[in-house]
Structures are given as C-alpha cells and as structure tokens.
Amino acid sequence: MSVAELLWDLLGNWQGVEEQSASPFAPAARTRAMTTFKQDLAGTAVLQDYRQVRDDAGEFLAHGVLLADPSGSAPGAVLWWLFDTTAQVPGPARGTWGDGRLTLVRTSPRGSAHHTFALEGGRLADAIDLELGDQPRTPFLRGRYERVSGH
C-alpha cells in the first residue's frame, strides 16, 4: 500500500486553533494554524505544508515529507521529515498510522518530540509532547482543526 493510500483520510486542507505551552523555543500562546496534507510523486509521498500565526503576527512555517518506512516492521510504518523556519536540518521521525492516528517521534540533540495526529469525528487533533534533556515529558502543543476541503 502506498503512503498516500495509507494516509488517505488525513489528506486535505485543515485549519484551527492551537494552545502552545511556554518552552525554550517560544512563549505560551494561542495561535491560528493551517495545515495541508497532499499526495505527490504518484502517491509514494505525502507532503505537508503548515503555517502557524501568533497574535503578535509572528509566523512559524513548516514543510513535511512523509514516506513509507521500508525498514519498518510494524504495519503502517512511516518516516517524516519536517523542515521549518528554525532552519534545523531534520533527521527522520519514525512512526505508524493506525486506527485514525499518526504517531511520530522526532529525536535531535535537544531531545525528542512526540507527535500525534488523530482523526476524531471528522476533525483533526494534533498533540506534541516534548522531552528535553533529562526533563520529564511535557505537553507542548494541542491543536484542533476543521477540514476546509477534502483530498
């Protein structure tokens, strides 16, 4: 199964509101966000475009690439690269898709970020938890989005 078939229900344009906790990267904020997941490269890739707008008009932009994980042993195994305005070179996050949930873990020298995209009754929820250094895992972002347009 191609990654586009695997993530079919996630494809589309979404917009909503996010609650972001204070972190070493940014102060706490309530933001507006838009994200798009679309198939590309004959369905072998899903591309993600993301835009977050803060009350102070500051923006955070990201471009993601999702591919099937050829070495993944779990059904629905995926790899995700997320390039963003922090200009850090990303390593791949590893994760799985199943039961309407895409769970991914990105690891860097700063720590790890645990991402969960979940489809719930036609809406998309996004949760990001951070583990920085030897600190315990803490909630960082919670978002709720409505589908603006389909696949």
Where do the language-model regions lie?
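Hydrophobic small-molecule pocket/channel-lining residues, especially in calycin-type beta-barrels
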Residues: 1-151
